[in-house]
């Protein structure tokens, strides 16, 4: 069975790549835009102007998926464009292709949209609302703890080729009572991306105070300071726990608006960032997505599920853009899976050419 993957908020859109795809696949994109309603072209124009916006990234990833659907079924493109993006399908109208879904952080929201729960515009609105909640929660935390706003939150990617389980070892270090003072409790493991790589978040002063100890504990450690334009300590429960209830309520109201709140099963099961478990039911998937918005992304647990934890073996993964971060993670950590990049005109054409040849 196939696994379809979707990237998170850290992957900015290459507008030149996206425009090249749209130019070359103009007929297919016209079908997509017409099927997604009058607001879809406005969303596309917004993406061109705001390629780093969370709403842009989520919508762009969904558009890659819709293009994949059409190109995979060229005999009747009108039927293959997900009409549910404007008018939500009834529960008995499911996609023919059976597959598992996996998104990294924000990408898990795209997984919910692929399950026909809400429109493309809804996806855009939820992604931006989630980001706004995190910004507000961060600002309230700074005020409540009387922290100077010049002390920004940063994100560091840590990698160590000699580590056996770097995320767990870093977490153990953070839990050490003799290492961190009470004022240094803003540091958290945000993403457990592999056994040799993780991302930590925290106030810059707290992170800097830990730099020497990190280098002493982990030989050949590489620290990469990531861009963080919204000053959000992503997946940091100390700061972002308050976002859960309003985010859940916001999504639930959208489901009620669309009449999808009464549905039970997902069209396509989702492997959850929260714990690596597979969500088959909508309320489980929604609950896990909301909780993981303020908890560590346990991607290493997702690899365990992909490699040996699914009822039907996963033998192929289609990794949608923007960007190839998730493609590289799956390729390195799930060696038995045929991992395919679906991020550019060249990779899209290569995939469908190979798929057509295999049919013959």
UniProtKB/Swiss-Prot annotation:
One of its GO terms (biological process) is fatty acid metabolic process. Keywords: Acyltransferase, Fatty acid biosynthesis, Fatty acid metabolism, Lipid biosynthesis, Lipid metabolism, Mitochondrion, Transferase, Transit peptide. Its EC number is 2.3.1.39. It catalyses: holo-[ACP] + malonyl-CoA = malonyl-[ACP] + CoA. The active site is at residues 105, 235. It is found in: Mitochondrion. SUPFAM superfamilies: FabD/lysophospholipase-like. Pathway: Lipid metabolism; fatty acid biosynthesis. Residues 1-24 form a transit peptide. GO terms for molecular function: [acyl-carrier-protein] S-malonyltransferase activity. PANTHER family: MALONYL-COA-ACYL CARRIER PROTEIN TRANSACYLASE, MITOCHONDRIAL. Belongs to the FabD family. Involved in biosynthesis of fatty acids in mitochondria. Present with 1360 molecules/cell in log phase SD medium. This is Malonyl CoA-acyl carrier protein transacylase, mitochondrial. It comes from Saccharomyces cerevisiae (strain ATCC 204508 / S288c) (Baker's yeast). The gene is MCT1.
């Amino acid at each position: 069975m196939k696994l379809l993957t979707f990237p998170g908020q850290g992957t900015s859109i290459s507008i030149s790549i996206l425009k090249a795809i749209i130019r070359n696949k103009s007929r297919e994109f016209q079908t997509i835009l017409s099927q997604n309603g009058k607001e879809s072209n406005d969303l596309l124009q917004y993406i061109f102007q705001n390629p780093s916006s969370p709403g842009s990234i989520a919508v762009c990833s969904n558009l890659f998926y819709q293009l994949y659907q059409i190109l995979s079924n060229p005999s009747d493109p009108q039927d293959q464009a997900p009409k549910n993006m404007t008018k939500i399908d009834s529960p008995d109208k499911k996609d023919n292709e059976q597959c598992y879904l996996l998104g990294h952080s924000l990408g898990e929201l795209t997984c919910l949209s692929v399950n026909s729960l809400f429109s493309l515009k809804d996806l855009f609105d939820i992604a931006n609302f989630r980001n706004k909640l995190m910004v507000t929660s961060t600002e309230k935390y700074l005020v409540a703890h009387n922290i100077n706003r010049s002390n920004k939150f940063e994100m560091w990617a840590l990698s160590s080729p000699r580590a056996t389980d770097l995320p767990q070892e870093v977490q153990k270090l953070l839990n050490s009572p003799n290492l961190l003072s009470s004022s240094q409790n803003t540091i958290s493991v945000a993403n457990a991306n592999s056994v040799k790589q993780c991302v930590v978040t925290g106030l810059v002063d707290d992170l800097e105070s830990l730099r020497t100890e990190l280098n002493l504990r982990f030989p050949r450690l590489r620290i990469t300071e990531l861009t963080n334009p919204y000053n959000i300590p992503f997946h940091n429960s100390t700061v972002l726990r308050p976002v859960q209830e309003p985010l859940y309520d916001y999504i639930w109201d959208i489901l009620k608006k669309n009449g999808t709140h009464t549905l039970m099963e997902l069209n396509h099961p989702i492997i959850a960032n929260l714990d690596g478990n597979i969500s088959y039911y909508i309320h489980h998937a929604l609950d896990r997505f909301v909780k993981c918005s303020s908890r560590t992304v346990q991607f290493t647990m997702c690899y365990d599920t992909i490699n040996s934890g699914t009822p039907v073996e996963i033998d192929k993964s289609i990794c949608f853009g923007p960007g190839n971060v998730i493609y590289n993670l799956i390729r390195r950590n799930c060696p038995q899976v045929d991992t395919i990049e679906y991020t550019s005109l060249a990779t899209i054409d290569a995939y469908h050419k190979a798929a057509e040849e295999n049919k013959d």
